[in-house]
Regions:
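Active-site C-terminal subdomain of aminotransferase-like
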Residues: 1-91, 96-97
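Conserved C-terminal alpha-helix-loop-beta "cap" of PLP-dependent enzymes
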Residues: 77-146
């Protein structure tokens, strides 16, 4: 199993590989064979360690996603256009109905300063993180609403 310190935890770089002693020994051998490795990685380790100290903050990101999900769920105007899915993470997935144009939706959001990701033709992903403020959440809700009406 791998664990990334930069995803959601906010460290600028770093991952951890987890496994049995035998597995880690084998992974180190492959790393040497492939020429991987870095020197003086203490500064990276310190940033990863700091991100672990702040790990409870990720719950705030989950709450941001839940807040936007609740907003979407309360609006009947979205029925027939897309359905939101939230699974207790910092992400919301918008599943678009047949005939609804997810790519235009993304373009309209982007024009308004809201970035999202196209997973496939019918699914858009919204990700919430430490740099999304309360004011940003209000902006995101407004732009999701107005972009869905176009």
């Amino acid at each position: 199993m791998t664990f990334c310190f930069s995803k959601a935890l906010g460290a600028p770089i770093g991952s951890m590989l987890l496994g049995s002693k035998e597995f880690i020994t084998e992974a180190r051998e492959y790393r040497k064979i492939l020429g991987g490795g870095m020197r003086q990685v203490g500064v990276i380790a310190s940033m990863a360690n700091k991100s672990l100290d702040l790990r409870e903050r990720i719950l705030e990101d989950h709450q941001k996603a839940k807040d936007v999900f609740d907003f979407i769920s309360e609006k009947q105007e979205f029925d027939g256009f897309f359905k939101a899915e939230y699974k207790n993470t910092n992400m919301i997935f918008l599943k678009f109905s047949d005939g609804a144009n997810s790519q235009n939706f993304i373009k309209n959001l982007e024009k308004e300063g809201v970035l999202s990701g196209l997973i496939n033709d019918k699914t858009v992903r919204l990700v919430f993180h430490k740099d999304v403020s309360t004011d940003d959440l209000v902006h995101v809700k407004e732009k999701i609403y107005s972009s869905s009406l176009i």
